[in-house]
Amino acid sequence: MKESDFPKNSMEALEKLKIGNDRFVNGLRSVEHFPTPSKLKDLADQGQRPYCIILSCADSRVPSELVFDQGLGDLIVLRVAGNVIAPSLLASMEFATTSFHTPLIVVLGHSRCGIIQATVDNLKDRFKPASENIQRLITKITPSVEPHLAQNGNHPNLLDLCAIENVYHTVKSILDESEILRDLVKEQKLAIISAFFNLNTGRVEFNPSLSDHLSAI
């Protein structure tokens, strides 16, 4: 990305994502996702200038570069099942924001999330994790699922409600666990926002509303 194209602040960065997602939803593309060897060399020589960090689920149907129609070097994408936070992910965010002055972090959940479903099933004694590592992941997601399972257990949008709650929980964890990122937010040099990707439509909802998903049948 040219320096002149780099967003001046988090709002401009967010607008680039919104416009890119509009293109994706409408089947349009403005970015060369498969550059030629000469273009790759240019990118390597120029270095990277990512304007956004995206923490998304490991689900193979949620490729951030395509969902937001962004090119190589535009985004730092961190992927882990359930888009939960861990020390290595926090360190990656801290490194990017301090090295590249990246102004925006997006935590991206999505509909029909497999690990959210597994957490629901685990709480209902319908799923036994195959390993301690999977159990630890489910344990981390459980606080976002338990309240909705108790209050909205039969709601058709239960998984979406839990996924959105989990996104907000991750944003809070980032702010709680990283002094560097917390200070950048206070200084208005960084914004950390929640987002939700609808697999059916391709649309990304920023700062998703739980009440909207509760009322939607």
Protein language model features and the residues they cover:
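Divalent-metal-activated hydrolytic enzyme cores
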Residues: 1-47, 72-73, 82-102, 114-217
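Short glycine-enriched loops at secondary-structure junctions
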Residues: 56-61, 81-84, 110-113
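Long, hydrophobic/aromatic N-terminal blocks
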Residues: 35-40, 56-60, 64
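Conserved functional hotspot residues or short segments at active or partner-binding sites
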Residues: 107
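Residues in well-ordered beta-strands of folded domains
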Residues: 55, 79, 196
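Short, glycine/acidic-enriched capping/hinge loops at junctions between secondary-structure elements
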Residues: 28-29, 63-68
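Short helix-loop-beta junction
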Residues: 69-77
